[in-house]
Amino acid sequence: MPIPLHEVRERTFAGTRRRIFQLLVDMGTSNDVIWPFAAQPFMRSPGPLIPGKTEEWHNGFHAVLEEVAPEERIVWRIQNEGFEGTHGFYLSGDAKKTTVEHRIDATLSDTEGRLLWRRLEDANERSMEALFDKIARVLKR
C-alpha cells in the first residue's frame, strides 16, 4: 500500500527574500556558498533554472525542476524509483525577515520508496539543518 510522506523543515532568517532566493538558485553551481557538505556534493545541471530541463543530484536523490517563482519558490520533481512527488523551497516574509520552508510531498511505494526513504531520512534531516545553519552564517557576512 502506498504511503504518503509530508516532511517540513523551516527557519526564519534576517535577510531578504531576494538574497536568500539567489543563494538557493546558486546551490549546486560554482557560485554555491551554502551547501554544507563538500564530501557529499549537491550538483545541478549548469545554466539558469529551467523547468523540465534543470536537474539536481544530492544525498541519493535525483530530481528535475518543476517550478520556479522568483523570490517565492523552487520546486523539484523527484525522479527516484518508488517516490512520486516533489521537494522544494518556499520563501515568505517581509523586507527584513524571510522564512524558508523546505517541503517534501510525496507518495512512497511499498518497497522501493519506503526503503529509499528509510536510508535517506536521517541524511535529509542533517542536510536541511546544516543548510539552514550555513545560510544563517552567510547572511551575517
Stretches with model-predicted labels:
Residues 79-130:
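Beta-strand/loop substructures that line and gate deep hydrophobic ligand-binding cavities in soluble
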Residues 37-44, 133-141:
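Short, highly charged C-terminal tails/helix-capping segments
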Residues 28, 124-140:
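Short amphipathic alpha-helical signal-transduction/dimerization elements
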Residues 1-46:
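Hydrophobic ligand-binding cavity/cleft-lining segments
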Residues 14-18, 66-71, 90-99:
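A short, structured loop/turn motif at beta-sheet edges
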Residues 50-58, 74-80:
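Short beta-strand segments that buttress and anchor functional surface loops
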Residues 20-24, 30-31, 65, 74-76, ...:
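Hydrophobic pocket/interface hotspot
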Residues 6-8, 58-62, 83-88:
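Short, surface-exposed coil-to-beta transition loops
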